[in-house]
């Protein structure tokens, strides 16, 4: 695959083309994304998987994270999920992932007031689609994550980092590594983006440009 850097709009358009024109189900892309993140977590020396927390939003980025948690759980990795947001408003594909995780018995936590015991945190709150500043409860969670001793893996983009220019949208997760899907993002190659994304892996999950 040719190395190119894309914007959030291009990422959306490429997703739409792959799903609606090519016919690859969005759920398949979500599984591939989660598998790429899971594999990187298992192979990287930056992560101690003694105790893992996946912080998942209610959009598709969160669905990726929930699937990561399930894959780790099935490999006997001690992992829990914190779902950030109203589960009644969760996206369609993420709802499917949530049900699968529950059926497998992946444990959930209702609060994350104490992150000191976790060795790895997976940031799956917001991906490339973030268009507003991170505030309120989510900003508080970002601060919790950044102040924890855990190493952080970001899914697609660190939460709070603008995918187009790397600007911080209010506040942002500082990750040790980021697995971004199919194409690198413009925001990840900016000075700030590199600082907050850490080591970037571009995972080929089968999304292509029109």
Swiss-Prot record:
K(+) binds at residues 61, 123, 159. Residues 11-210 form the YjeF N-terminal domain. Pfam families: YjeF_N. Keywords: Isomerase, Metal-binding, NAD, NADP, Nucleotide-binding, Potassium. Binds 1 potassium ion per subunit. The keyword Ribosomal protein does not apply. Disulfide bonds: none annotated. (6S)-NADPHX binds at residues 60-64, 127-133, 156. Its EC number is 5.1.99.6. One of its GO terms (molecular function) is metal ion binding. Its cofactor is K(+). InterPro entries: YjeF_N_dom, YjeF_N_dom_sf, YJEFN_prot_NAXE-like. It catalyses: (6R)-NADHX = (6S)-NADHX; (6R)-NADPHX = (6S)-NADPHX. It is an enzyme of class 5 (isomerase). Catalyzes the epimerization of the S- and R-forms of NAD(P)HX, a damaged form of NAD(P)H that is a result of enzymatic or heat-dependent hydration. This is a prerequisite for the S-specific NAD(P)H-hydrate dehydratase to allow the repair of both epimers of NAD(P)HX. NCBIfam families: yjeF_nterm. Belongs to the NnrE/AIBP family. This is NAD(P)H-hydrate epimerase.
